[in-house]
C-alpha cells in the first residue's frame, strides 16, 4: 500500500522546477497511476509552472484518471485566458474524458472561443458527452488503455476510414472517430493512412494524429513525423506531439532528429525532445516501467 507521505514525496519531484523535466514527467505518470486525492492535489498544484508542456501533460493525466475531483481545477484552466492555448485545449479535452455532463454548459460556451484549438477541443468534448448520453455507456475499452476524445467508428475498411479521416467537409468528431478506428485496426496501411492526416487543415487534428502515431509505435510513419517536427512553419503544438511520437517509436532513425531539435528555439519543442529522448532510452533499456516514481523513492 502506498502511503500519503510517499505520494507527497513523488509530488515534490513533480513540482520542483529545479528537477530535470524527464524526472518530473516520470513523477507525474506515477501519480496518475496511483490516483486518489493526494495525487490529484499534487498534479493540480503544477498548473502554476512556467512550462506549457508540463501543464498540458498535467491536464492530460487528470483526464485519463477520470476523477471528478479534478473538474474544478480543469474548469479553471480552461477559462484562464492567460494559460497557453495547448494547456487550455488539454483541460477541455480532459473534461470530456472525465465524462460528467455537468460541464456541458461551460464546454458549449468555450466552443466559441477565439482560440481555434480551444474551440475545436470543446466542440469535440461536447459531442463526446452527448454520445455518452445517447449510448448510456463508455465505448469499449481502447487496446491502448487510453480515454479518447471520440469513440472509434464501427467501420473496419481502411480505405473507407481514410476517406472519412481526410474529408475536411466532415464534422471533426466523425474524422476523429475514423482516426481512432484506424489506430485500433493497426497495421502498415492504417499507419500510412493516419500519417496522411499530418497534412490536414486543423492544427488540433494534426496534433492528435501525432499522438495516435506515437501510441502505435510503428516505424512506417517516422518520415512523416520527422518532416512535421522539422517544419518551422508547423504549429508548435503539432511539432511537440510529433517529437514525443518519435521518442515512443524509439527506433535508431528517430534518435538523430530528436537530438537535433533538443535545442530548438521553441521551448515546447525543445522540452518535448528532451522528454522524448528519455522515453527513447526507456523503450530501448532494461527498466521495467516508465512511471518509476516509487522505485526512485526506494533507491
Curated annotation (Swiss-Prot):
PANTHER family linked: DEOXYHYPUSINE HYDROXYLASE, PBS LYASE HEAT-LIKE PROTEIN
Role noted for this protein: Catalyzes the hydroxylation of the N(6)-(4-aminobutyl)-L-lysine intermediate produced by deoxyhypusine synthase/DHPS on a critical lysine of the eukaryotic translation initiation factor 5A/eIF-5A. This is the second step of the post-translational modification of that lysine into an unusual amino acid residue named hypusine. Hypusination is unique to mature eIF-5A factor and is essential for its function.
Alphabetical GO biological process terms: peptidyl-lysine modification to peptidyl-hypusine
Record note on cofactor: Binds 2 Fe(2+) ions per subunit.
Binding of Fe cation 2, residues: 89-90, 207
EC category name: oxidoreductase
Homology family: Belongs to the deoxyhypusine hydroxylase family.
Protein name as catalogued: Deoxyhypusine hydroxylase
Provenance organism: Gallus gallus
EC number annotated for this UniProt entry: 1.14.99.29
Cofactor(s) named in the record: Fe(2+)
UniProt KW Oxidoreductase keyword: yes
UniProt keyword Metal-binding present: yes
Amino acid at each position: 500500500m502506498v502511503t500519503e507521505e510517499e505520494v507527497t514525496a513523488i509530488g515534490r519531484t513533480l513540482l520542483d522546477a529545479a528537477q530535470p523535466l524527464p524526472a518530473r514527467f516520470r513523477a507525474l505518470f506515477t501519480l496518475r497511476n496511483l490516483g486518489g486525492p493526494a495525487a490529484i492535489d499534487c498534479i493540480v498544484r503544477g498548473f502554476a509552472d512556467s512550462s506549457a508542456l508540463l501543464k498540458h501533460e498535467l491536464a492530460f493525466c487528470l483526464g485519463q484518471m477520470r476523477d471528478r475531483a479534478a473538474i474544478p481545477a480543469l474548469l479553471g484552466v480552461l477559462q484562464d485566458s492567460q494559460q497557453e492555448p495547448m494547456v487550455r485545449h488539454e483541460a477541455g479535452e480532459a473534461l470530456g474524458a472525465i465524462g460528467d455532463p455537468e460541464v456541458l454548459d461551460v464546454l458549449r460556451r468555450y466552443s466559441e472561443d477565439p482560440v481555434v484549438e480551444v474551440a475545436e477541443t470543446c466542440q469535440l468534448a461536447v459531442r463526446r458527452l452527448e454520445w455518452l448520453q445517447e449510448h448510456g455507456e463508455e465505448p469499449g475499452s481502447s487496446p491502448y488503455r487510453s480515454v479518447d476524445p471520440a469513440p472509434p467508428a464501427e467501420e473496419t475498411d481502411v480505405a473507407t476510414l481514410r476517406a472519412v479521416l481526410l474529408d475536411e467537409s466532415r464534422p471533426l468528431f466523425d474524422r476523429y472517430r475514423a482516426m481512432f478506428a484506424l489506430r485500433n485496426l493497426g497495421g502498415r496501411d492504417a499507419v500510412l493512412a493516419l500519417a496522411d492526416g499530418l497534412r490536414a487543415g486543423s492544427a488540433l487534428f494534426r496534433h492528435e494524429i501525432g499522438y495516435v502515431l506515437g501510441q502505435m509505435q510503428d516505424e512506417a510513419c517516422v518520415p512523416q513525423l520527422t518532416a512535421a517536427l522539422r517544419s518551422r512553419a508547423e504549429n508548435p503544438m503539432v511539432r511537440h506531439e510529433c517529437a514525443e511520437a518519435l521518442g515512443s517509436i524509439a527506433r535508431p532513425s528517430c534518435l538523430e532528429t530528436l537530438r537535433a531539435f533538443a535545442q530548438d528555439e521553441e521551448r515546447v519543442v525543445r522540452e518535448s525532445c528532451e522528454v522524448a529522448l528519455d522515453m527513447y532510452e526507456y523503450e530501448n533499456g532494461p527498466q521495467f516501467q516508465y512511471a518509476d516514481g516509487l522505485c526512485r523513492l526506494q533507491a
